[in-house]
């Protein structure tokens, strides 16, 4: 899912995968077959196929996938193309996977729709190519959290991004779960990852592709490239750090 979504975020269509597996001696055939079935099911969603890879034995289970894609003649959409005045928009669910994690950590198993969002993401795979065709200037998969990933765009583009919290629609499922756990649902939306939604910037006045919702604007850098929420820094919304 993560690899395909990253291809999507550059405006490309995933076409094929190569998969490497290191399997401990106690790995069962049944587990391998279930893994293969899940991989095939996700490939079917985007019309891709596993075209090769490698198998090896080892002490620990290791899985590695590389996805190849087709830009269909378009230029890749990078993180470095956002310009002051651009509109910031997002497509896909935000905060659902993080809500599912929070529910499980508190010892609950419901609402199932949120728990399942954590266990099985549902990315908007077709949104990347549509955004590219509509003139997106920068784009990123938000697997590490919306604010954190928009920070990558801000730094790569040398700009700042200002988000407006009242533009986010909090789904009833999120609101109910947040109330039960005494959590601000906006924190899940802004900092939670693993939903694999897409965030993109578009030129001002550009019609947004279907499914994209405007959530903020790109500005000239404010001292340094940063992401602000309602004009304020939010250090509590750091998202996931791969090296921390």
Describe the residue ranges of each PLM region.
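Glycine-rich anion-binding loops of enzyme active sites
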Residues: 13-102
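A short, charged helix-loop
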Residues: 108-122
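Internal active-site segments that recognize and position negatively charged phosphoryl groups
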Residues: 83-92, 120-146
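Short, compositionally biased
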Residues: 98-112
